[in-house]
């Protein structure tokens, strides 16, 4: 007879301590935290939050320890398929995570994968992007952490902490690590996506050595250790204690903002934003950045309140897709491309680690963005005034950054997609500024990409370029900065075609076909008017720890520097996303104003033809073009 035990007695929606001797201390909320309302969907907390354990055993849960009045229950469970943990943690549909023990198994498997000294009596951080299921998940994580001997957890108020903020808090508070509840730029809501990942003590995502162990332990897990404590009130800043275990609810903005103020010259940026001839707009996409936009851009930098759009974090992101690109941030694009549009526009994604930068009727590609930031950082950003240790990009990102590194004589690294590869270089003191073509940009101030950091970096550059511009004189614009950069370094025309939620079988067969093609390819082969320099499946050897990562993307590199790259993305929750990257370098300034899709058309046609993408996926056109 299958055993099913529901932990209804201590997973409840209200904060009701079981023991009269449990101390409770609630402090006043920090004034730095913005007033915002997280949208609530109708649900029964008891149903959604209950952890149910299924086992062939008919035994009841056993109390395995009761230190300082905390009862720890050992609940039988069994492995659940499909918990393979990737570069961005575990992402699935909400309904999958709501299956009995699905989340609890993964959290317990994580603790089973860590050395005890990495969490026993230690400090962990917990936060997320405010999406649907975060509130229930937070209570589950807190109780399992307590059950496994964690000493204290810091939780963002209302469970809110952006991914960059989690990294910042881990580093400032010297925590052992932290949980991030997010599916990043993927949609949220009962029918959409949820995700969880773990960051280590440096603030960077857990390495593959740990994520592989987590997956292995999900295949053999037999029990969940969970503390019999009530739900913790996450709506007020303060400390709640249960014996030797405590939960501190913190202002999600203050530590992160304090760090940013050491990186940038806020007075310089404020002098730009407060100019009557400069108009700024930021689209938070109803995601976590909305919790940071008002304290940073309005309260600190004097932007007008109406310059922040979609600034209230919602559990379903306002029925939107919180991915800052030309397709999903179309409202911002429309504003920026309108007649007499703002001078500067930006957007961030679900968990606040990605960004999109726009000028008046001008889109800055992420590849160009990181290159421009790197080229101007020493002059415009105080954090880099003494030195820039090195530059790095993900392999699919255009070579624009390479040219900056070469001109400035800086160390340069090309890594696989995944921020953890940058983190290793940063921890070794080899890297300062890095970026990915997937709208991720950042530096070694933390160990995650950082959307608001990128916005502030761009504002710093524009402010620096205009510090001597008098009222009435034409401001140096975003497009001016980029075009000047192209004139100095040349332009890397770049585009990415995304084919989302393809049938996995067809997508995998396409990659297999391309790998077979690699084995037959040789330098000098002609592909239309392009001559092959080399073709490979990208392999990376980490210069810090010597680890090797293979099969990171099929590359065709031609003698003129043009590239075609094919990858399957691991950040979605369903199906496969096929990504095709096309790049061509153009040194001729007279050709820099050509539309990228026109300049790249011959190479795009070649990319689709060589891969037989339509035959394998059935797709006539991409979901998103960047």
Curated annotation (Swiss-Prot):
Residues 1-66 form a transit peptide. Pfam families: PGM1_C_vert_fung, PGM_PMM_I, PGM_PMM_II, PGM_PMM_III. It catalyses: alpha-D-glucose 1-phosphate = alpha-D-glucose 6-phosphate; O-phospho-L-seryl-[protein] + alpha-D-glucose 1-phosphate = alpha-D-glucose 1,6-bisphosphate + L-seryl-[protein]; alpha-D-glucose 1,6-bisphosphate + L-seryl-[protein] = O-phospho-L-seryl-[protein] + alpha-D-glucose 6-phosphate. The keyword GTP-binding does not apply. It is found in: Plastid, Chloroplast. One of its GO terms (molecular function) is phosphoglucomutase activity. Keywords: Carbohydrate metabolism, Chloroplast, Glucose metabolism, Isomerase, Magnesium, Metal-binding, Phosphoprotein, Plastid, Transit peptide. Belongs to the phosphohexose mutase family. This is Phosphoglucomutase, chloroplastic. It comes from Pisum sativum (Garden pea). The gene is PGMP.
